[in-house]
Amino acid sequence: MKIEEVKSTTKTQRIATHSHVKGLGLDENGIAKQAAAGLVGQENAREACGVIVELIKSKKMAGRAVLLAGPPGTGKTALALAIAQELGNKVPFCPMVGSEVYSTEIKKTEVLMENFRRAIGLRIRETKEVYEGEVTELTPCETENPMGGYGKTISHVIIGLKTAKGTKQLKLDPSIYESLQKERVEVGDVIYIEANSGAVKRQGRSDTYATEFDLEAEEYVPLPKGDVHQKKEVIQDVTLHDLDVANARPQGGQDILSMMGQLMKPKKTEITDKLRGQINKVVNKYIDQGIAELVPGVLFIDEVHMLDIECFTYLHRALESSLAPIVIFATNRGNCIIRGTEDVASPHGIPLDLLDRVMIIRTMLYTPQEMKQIIKIRAQTEGINISEEALNHLGEIGTKTTLRYSVQLLTPANLLAKINGKDSIEKEHVEEINELFYDAKSSAKILAEQQEKFMK
């Protein structure tokens, strides 16, 4: 007798840099806890982000911009991801990097506009009228063919539907009769018919017929419990970019040209302003009718100093348009030259007139104690045991070098501990690994000392 164990098919999730961030870690009054939801320290910045989240949720923040500014490794990207976690999956969050806008196929401004539209959601509410029940009768009514001849045409179909609450007799259009034939509906089947579109769906055979012996294996379903005529509300979430793409490249077409077009490599197409204008008109009409509501989301642009002066000028116009999301910039630059200009220096590499429109949130350097806490959280996330001594030593390394470097030493040190037959990382493992690798500062120091030996 052979017994096999079934292995789980779930994919093992790779631990990314910010896997441990679960939210902003604020209490009910919006005050930041010292360490919560994977974030440590940065209380002022987290509280400011909490205010931004509240403004976004109350839809009072659209078209504004926020800048997260601070030295490298102080948690700017982590804060942006925490904002995304706080907002939940119903609010669109579109992350991008400043260098993404440079493409050989489409304009820089087009890439920006695409991401702007990705960050604006549309929640469409649709009420569907549905007739559901077990078919008790199915009678097509025929009339003489108006075109002459001996054939007859179906004028309408009488169908009886039964549920646990009652029965109804419906008179249906002849076009629905074709759908009934396609679905092979017979008396005793449970079906539902959509009133708006006329779509028919056969759910299965009623379970009162389950005792019948049939050659074909049927799926038996219980008798529907509610009324025959029901109204269901369906909510769909789409982004404006989804609507743009759907209308820019309509699928289908049976002629040879469209067939060839589908076979060829799809080139990235630019969506024209005219098309976007028409989509905006339709969206505004839906909003006025109350069918849809606009959900302004978040566009997160990391390394914003990589954008050039043309992109910044375009951002001015985009931020002031009626359909604009909340834009969060992040940069680690101090005073530097704006890309695309010869000698115009500006704080954070952003033009002063755009800086004037943004609310700036500063992130501060971590204290040694906070660094230790972050390293401890990372070790727990990666499932690594670490002794107190090793943790203190890693905290010291982080203070001298950078937080990223000390976090990166965790996995190699864990590997070394396992080779030595230890369950947890000890101080000597960290010291040994630290001697093998260089951080950025010590590497630059060696480079300065041995400059003449390197190629110019």
UniProtKB/Swiss-Prot annotation:
InterPro entries: AAA+_ATPase, P-loop_NTPase, RuvB-like, RuvB-like_C, RuvBL1/2_DNA/RNA_bd_dom, TIP49_P-loop
Coiled coil (residue ranges): none
A matching Pfam family: TIP49
Gene Ontology, cellular component aspect: dynein axonemal particle; Ino80 complex; MLL1 complex; NuA4 histone acetyltransferase complex; R2TP complex; Swr1 complex
The EC number(s) this enzyme carries: 3.6.4.12
Job of this protein: Has single-stranded DNA-stimulated ATPase and ATP-dependent DNA helicase (3' to 5') activity suggesting a role in nuclear processes such as recombination and transcription. Proposed core component of the chromatin remodeling INO80 complex which exhibits DNA- and nucleosome-activated ATPase activity and catalyzes ATP-dependent nucleosome sliding.
Family: Belongs to the RuvB family.
Protein name (database record): RuvB-like 1
Species in which this protein is naturally found: Xenopus laevis
UniProt lineage: Eukaryota, Metazoa, Chordata, Craniata, Vertebrata
